[in-house]
């Protein structure tokens, strides 16, 4: 049991280093952690380390939870549980929005830099998985082409697949992009989003939200989602909204998938755009005139 006590101390230390919690929050966070982890008490341990991500500590906690029968040792069960653990050291949504706006007052880039770091520190963006992705550039007659192989989505465990088939049907949240995902605990067939924090945006007078993609296909891959669950539809408003977003975040790009099945976006049921801080081959390509 002393090992899990030390893991709790390590996570509290990490959370304070990354600014997820303040020293005044430590006792409160520790009590939440012992409840989630099924531990009766907390005995602080001295910790002197600097970690890039919480993954090493979370792996210790997950192994311990599986050994004690708290969770089944599958990818989905571990992902659901480590998200619940990290929520114990997360700021509330209103605190994140307030901090984002304070940084935005200095500069939009400072705000997104802070928000992206938060998304990694919270393990919402699983950096250790993202780092496995393979990317390279290939020279073609049309210019350098970016090629990526995304390996950040883990393989499904047969036990998780079986559980998902038996899971009770639910229409809440309506889809993976709905704002109701913020704080949602997840289930066998829906990922946990307890560490998910949205940034409200006003695009052309309508309520939209900013978030980062947890799978990150390119640098600072963000999603701009409609506050309402309405289907994707390319129209004049699409380009007006994209232009409005770029006025708010001039250091980002923004674009929309097609509103067509198969060739378009993967979630056509919810209006959204994608953006980020990356220069694609199309932007670097020379123009031709006939």
Where are the regions a protein language model picked out?
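Hydrophobic side chains in beta-strands
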Residues: 149, 212, 256, 275-277
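A short secondary-structure junction signal
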Residues: 222-223, 234-237, 285
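Active-site microenvironments that recognize anionic phosphate/pyrophosphate groups
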Residues: 1-224, 228-231
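Helical scaffold of the NTase/Pol beta-like nucleotidyltransferase catalytic core
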Residues: 194-201, 227-254
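Conserved His + Asp/Glu catalytic blocks
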Residues: 233, 251-254, 260-266, 277-290
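Short acidic (Asp/Glu) patches
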Residues: 192-194, 257-260
